[in-house]
Design a protein with these regions (language model features):
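Non-catalytic, conserved peripheral segments adjacent to functional cores
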Residues: 1-100, 117-118, 124, 129-140, ...
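Well-ordered alpha/beta subsegment
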Residues: 97-101, 107-114
Length: 151
């Protein structure tokens, strides 16, 4: 059992964004030491996907057993509702205008709301896609697993 292990808490991470000539660049790399130009990705990059939805629609509504994810918004604004350590809840907000990404460790239930008409979410994962073995789609099952791990 783990009690409030910080490794299993969602965390906002500031990243560098470079703007010039009417555009911007956000580099992420897997390196042992932070270099001057890029952002050191806090997880190993195994998979990347993009997601969008209509304004006020949501995606997610699940947790992962093993996968950590780094979520950042490249257009619009996004709200992420999280539940972790059985019953702790916290909302996070990320947007194109703020240079923060959200690190979601395993065993965090998340529901992602697209707050703008053209919001786009980029997700970096440290685990391959495996819906049957890796996803927790049932909230009661998530609570039971969390109780065993954190209480």
């Amino acid at each position: 059992m783990l009690k409030n292990n910080k490794r299993f808490l969602p965390k906002l991470i500031k990243y560098k964004k470079y703007s010039e000539k009417g555009g911007y660049l956000i580099p992420f790399e897997n390196v042992k030491k932070r270099i001057a130009l890029g952002n050191n990705c806090p997880i190993k990059i195994k998979r990347i996907f993009f997601s969008s939805a209509k304004k006020n629609a949501f995606r997610g509504d699940h947790a992962h057993k093993l996968c950590s994810q780094l979520l950042f918004c490249v257009n619009g604004s996004i709200k992420i509702e999280t539940i972790f350590h059985v019953n702790k809840k916290k909302n996070y907000y990320i947007s194109r205008n703020k240079n923060y990404a959200l690190l979601l460790p395993p065993l965090v239930w998340s529901k992602i709301y697209f707050k703008s008409k053209k919001s786009i979410l980029v997700v970096i994962c440290d685990y391959k896609y495996d819906n049957k073995k890796e996803y927790i789609n049932n909230f009661d099952q998530f609570i039971n697993i969390s109780k065993k791990k954190f209480i």
